[in-house]
């Protein structure tokens, strides 16, 4: 799955997701894309699930680019453990997504097939997204 090989720090602060995307808001590789409309956190499992649904719909036709990567660790303490005694262990990896960020790109397929694939993947993600195109 999508986790970094090495990080500078083992654990991160929770932080807030404010403002719009400062980069990665235009199509760079493909002709069609999926753009986020609201802020949120995507887990590596959600990104992988969306990627699988896209590749199943396309059936070896065209090319897919994943424009997000899960850099941020999320820690969690086990159940029935009292407060204190340090921060919990890493539970999952997430990527913080701002409004306007391109999540996936596709090229080499028809408009209808691209729309279908990206709408199926959109159902797997916790943020609202919209289909965008170079051609439109």
Swiss-Prot record:
Database matches in Gene3D superfamilies: Ribosomal protein L10e/L16 (3.90.1170.10)
PROSITE patterns on file: RIBOSOMAL_L16_2
Keywords: Repeat, Ribonucleoprotein, Ribosomal protein, RNA-binding, rRNA-binding, tRNA-binding
Record-level GO cellular component terms: ribonucleoprotein complex; ribosome
Source taxon at top rank: Bacteria
Entry GO MF terms: rRNA binding; structural constituent of ribosome; tRNA binding
Pfam families assigned: Ribosomal_L16
GO BP terms: translation
Record-linked InterPro entries: Ribosomal_uL16, Ribosomal_uL16_bact-type, Ribosomal_uL16_CS, Ribosomal_uL16_dom, Ribosomal_uL16_sf
Family note: Belongs to the universal ribosomal protein uL16 family.
Role: Binds 23S rRNA and is also seen to make contacts with the A and possibly P site tRNAs.
Assembly information from the UniProt record: Part of the 50S ribosomal subunit.
PANTHER family membership: 50S/60S RIBOSOMAL PROTEIN L16, LARGE RIBOSOMAL SUBUNIT PROTEIN UL16M
Protein name stated in the entry: Large ribosomal subunit protein uL16
Species this protein is from: Ehrlichia ruminantium (strain Welgevonden)
Gene name per UniProt: rplP
